[in-house]
Amino acid sequence: MNIFQDWPEPIVRVQSLSESNLGAIPNRYVKPLSQRPNITPHNKHNPQTTTIPIIDLGRLYTDDLTLQAKTLDEISKACRELGFFQVVNHGMSPQLMDQAKATWREFFNLPMELKNMHANSPKTYEGYGSRLGVEKGAILDWSDYYYLHYQPSSLKDYTKWPSLPLHCREILEDYCKEMVKLCENLMKILSKNLGLQEDRLQNAFGGKEESGGCLRVNYYPKCPQPELTLGISPHSDPGGLTILLPDEQVASLQVRGSDDAWITVEPAPHAFIVNMGDQIQMLSNSIYKSVEHRVIVNPENERLSLAFFYNPKGNVPIEPLKELVTVDSPALYSSTTYDRYRQFIRTQGPRSKCHIDELKSPR
């Protein structure tokens, strides 16, 4: 249960700051030197990018067993090493993907008084927001967002969904329905690649009907000093599985590589970016990795992305699956629940991987 009913300070919309044509960003968005992105006058408009694995899910449904095995192996390797990969032929039509992004661009272009009708609070975070965490005086990120629940049905509240633009709720319903299908499919693949029954991870989440599904739409306005701030600070996702529909025009998602360098991801056309969350890392006993990532901002272009989070039921125990714990591979994490776990980011905001590290079992 979240004890926080309201934000500790008045909320300022980053979009309003950006549209005021200020020459310098307010101090509360300026990151400490150690956290600032490596953006110079030479690369701040077009950061150097790299491609993370692009996996064709359609190859899993051919008659070619060798190709199926190769595809499963590619997914397994990505989950174990980088924690991120892109998927194409994932089952959602390009038209629906484009429609969803266009609808949310319309929402963020609405007059501020209409958007503020959906202003959120730290009690549930549902609605239109501009900060994560409730620490007074915290350094904030350069972004606004909209957060809503899709499942389980007990948490789904259409009154918390935007009513404008027209047909927004219908498009959201179609989009989230397809997202759940993709997540359920990926959960089967992840289970099989661990040598488990294909429903094992899903059951560990509490089953299909009780697993959580929520959408966070991120809006990153133009920023006059992108070298001083971040759209989202470094963090690993606290939930289970994240499916990101990125902005193909503005590359800004960065993933921390094995050498600790930040890799800017080049989105593939009409692909989703998939990453493991902390709950999957714990259930897999760290076989699968949830990896730190962050978002840089741009002086000339705003960016919009849709992140769908697929999470365990809030009160089910989350701990390394017994099938993956042996004498040689003891349990690396103590038991928790997702409800307890996510209070960390809801109170303190994005903080690297410090929370999952706190749950490591003493050796």
UniProtKB/Swiss-Prot annotation:
Signal peptide: none annotated. Fe cation binds at residues 235, 237, 293. 2-oxoglutarate binds at residues 218, 220, 303, 305. Jasmonate binds at residues 216, 342, 346. Keywords: Dioxygenase, Iron, Jasmonic acid signaling pathway, Metal-binding, Oxidoreductase, Plant defense. GO terms for biological process: defense response; negative regulation of defense response to insect; regulation of defense response to fungus; regulation of jasmonic acid mediated signaling pathway. PROSITE patterns: FE2OG_OXY (PS51471). One of its GO terms (molecular function) is iron ion binding. Disruption phenotype: The quadruple mutant jox1, jox2, jox3 and jox4 exhibit reduced root and shoot growth, delayed flowering, reduced seed production, constitutively elevated jasmonate and jasmonoyl-L-isoleucine levels, and enhanced resistance to the necrotrophic fungal pathogen Botrytis cinerea and the herbivorous caterpillar Mamestra brassicae. Its EC number is 1.14.11.-. Residues 210-312 form the Fe2OG dioxygenase domain. Pfam families: 2OG-FeII_Oxy, DIOX_N. Binds 1 Fe(2+) ion per subunit. Its cofactor is L-ascorbate; Fe(2+). It catalyses: jasmonate + 2-oxoglutarate + O2 = (1R,2R)-12-hydroxyjasmonate + succinate + CO2. 2-oxoglutarate-dependent dioxygenase involved in the oxidation of jasmonate (JA), a stress-induced phytohormone synthesized in response to attack by pathogens and herbivores, which triggers the activation of defense responses via the JA-mediated signaling pathway. Converts JA to 12-hydroxyjasmonate (12OH-JA), an inactive form of JA. Is specific to free JA, and cannot oxidize the bioactive form jasmonoyl-L-isoleucine (JA-Ile) or other JA-amino acid conjugates. Prevents over-accumulation of JA and indirectly its bioactive form JA-Ile under stress response. Belongs to the iron/ascorbate-dependent oxidoreductase family. This is Jasmonate-induced oxygenase 3. It comes from Arabidopsis thaliana. The gene is JOX3.
